[in-house]
Amino acid sequence: MTRSGYIVKWLLLGILPLLTAVGLPAYSADGDTLSQVKSRGTLRRGVSEGVAGFSAKDASGRWSGIDADFCRALAAAALGNADMVTFVPLKGSARFPALRTGIVDLLSRNTTWTLVREGTLGVQFASVLFYDGQAFMVPKQRGANAVAALDGATVCVEKGTSSEIHLADYFAARHLSVKPLVMDSASEAANAFFAGHCSAYTGDASALAAARLRAPGGAQSYTILPEQISKEPLGPVVRDDDAHWLTLVRWVFFSLIAAEEDNVTRENVGERMRDPVVERAFDAGDDVSKAIGVEPGWAVRAVQSVGNYGQIFDRNLGPGSPLNLERGLNRLWTQGGLMYAPPMR
């Protein structure tokens, strides 16, 4: 199917009702995204419908999570105000057409970077915000301790995700049988699992941990199996027709990594920038700021708004959060992880 074929198919599947539901006008996605964002005065960002630690509304109705914080950092860099973000909840099957048709300026909603997506959907991934892997959650009373124990089981999975593909491929390659129960959204898949319609629920390990927090009977009643059957590099996504916007999104993320590498935090960024060594490593200069279309000090504004990558992780996913996840591959490269910022100069 051609790229236009994908878009038409998805439009017919529900993207036009989404326009009405969120009160946003349809318009051509062509052109300078940054100029459109500045003219509009807000960054429109596609989010999940609620994944704790990534993008979910808190008790006050404010969006929180690592994805939400990244978008605030981008808004601070591009617009000078971290609060100039409009969050648009999207189902997995609606996220790419929403991006391609200009409903949102970028996606940052638990989206896996794959060749098929970049090669056929007219999108580009700016970076990896979180290294994850697909896992399985089962009721503790089931006693399963390996994925192979799920042979013949019914497994809940969200429609239109890489998890749906990996589930079928993994079991087929091992001559095991599986009965997928495909649901339209992650919340529906989780609810079906907790209601007993499935023996297991599969998805990104971090999303399973988030879903377990709201499990009936408590999180302690469910186990996430240690095996991971895929690599799931999750990151922000933009359209492939605006290299200028891609550059800005990518380097705002790298600035958050660079800040952690140089021990620049939300609290000390002003003081640390007085060190010429840190300033050179963390600020590419006024000419570069002009070239990418933002006011000087954009990286400082990003860190001042949400902190460096380590602070964002700890607050939303790590020891400062209900999820309490290990950083694992998301540690800095100097600490055995994969997070690494190219030099700014």
Model-identified regions with their sequence ranges:
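C-terminal functional modules
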Residues: 285-345
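Acidic, polar ligand-binding/catalytic clefts
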Residues: 72, 76, 80, 84-149, ...
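Bacterial N-terminal signal peptides
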Residues: 10-21
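Short, hydrophobic alpha-helical packing/hinge segments within bilobed ligand-binding/sensory domains
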Residues: 33, 70-71, 94-99, 186-192, ...
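Bacterial N-terminal signal peptides that target proteins for export
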Residues: 2-12
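Extracytoplasmic small-molecule ligand-binding "clamshell" domains
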Residues: 29-110, 292-294, 309, 332, ...
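Extended ligand-binding regions for polar small-molecule ligands
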Residues: 69-78, 140-144, 148, 153-154, ...
